[in-house]
Amino acid sequence: MINKLISNIRRTNAPIVVGLDPMLNYIPEHIQKKAFAEFGETLEGAAEAIWQYNKGIVDATYDLIPAVKPQIAMYEQFGIPGLAAYKKTVDYCKSKDLVVSGDIKRGDIGSTSAAYAVGHLGHVQVGSKKYAGFDEDFATVNPYLGSDGVKPFMDVCKEEKKGIFVLVKTSNPSSGEFQDREIDGRPLYELVGEKVAQWGDELMGDGYSYVGAVVGATYPEMGKVLRKIMPKTFILVPGYGAQGGKGAE
């Protein structure tokens, strides 16, 4: 899947990803009114408004961009209807040949991590058949629990030819409370970056690994260091724009 992402970027000449992080009060009033007229001011109505809003964004941009990144929490807050809207969004984006990176930030161990990985990137066994759950192409992963939390995702990625983006240095202001702490004279984010590079060596595409990294645009100097540590790692760079990251950096 990393090869498809790179191919899409080259085809569109746009190394960007469109975030589909809908907030109900930001959705245009006419979309909300139509959804509420059909489903009422209910979770189902909110989910319909979100789905229609997302569809409009995708229809307006799909031929200009390589990928989208829906943030699952924005859908989960609306319960099962919200998750249904998330799934519809994923499926619709894939029908437009967009690469879909599920911003799920999962982090657990053992069978729980494996279940997350299967649910978002793989196929679950049901009797004699297998079914895809959410079926994203990539997923974001929190490495705080170590290899026990990441390896199950890697196993599914290897089987499905999909990928992950591991949180290394995030864009939020308080990220340094843990990520910048030094261990034997080196910041934690550098050590995580080294581990991501090692994991990536096990899952290589054409030049880049299926194991990517999340490195915030709000910390460009740290990003330069991490690029040297992770030369074969595709980097997802949040924080551009509203959070203060600039293209020149």
Where are these regions (language model features)?
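N-terminal active-site wall of soluble small-molecule enzyme domains
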Residues: L64-P66, P70-A132, M222
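Acidic (Asp/Glu)-rich catalytic clusters
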Residues: V58-I65, V90-S95, M154-E159, R227-M230
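Conserved anion-binding
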Residues: I104, D108-G212
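A C-terminal functional module that forms or caps the active site or interfaces directly
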Residues: A217-E249
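N-terminal glycine-rich anion-binding loop in soluble enzyme alpha/beta folds
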Residues: M1-A60
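Conserved, mostly hydrophobic/aromatic
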Residues: V18, V68, D103, A139, ...
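Short, well-ordered coil/turn segments that N-cap beta-strands
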Residues: T12-I16, D63-P66, K96-L98, F134-D137, ...
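Active-site-proximal loop/turn and secondary-structure-junction residues that shape catalytic pockets
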Residues: P22-L24, I72-E76, R106-D108, P143-L145, ...
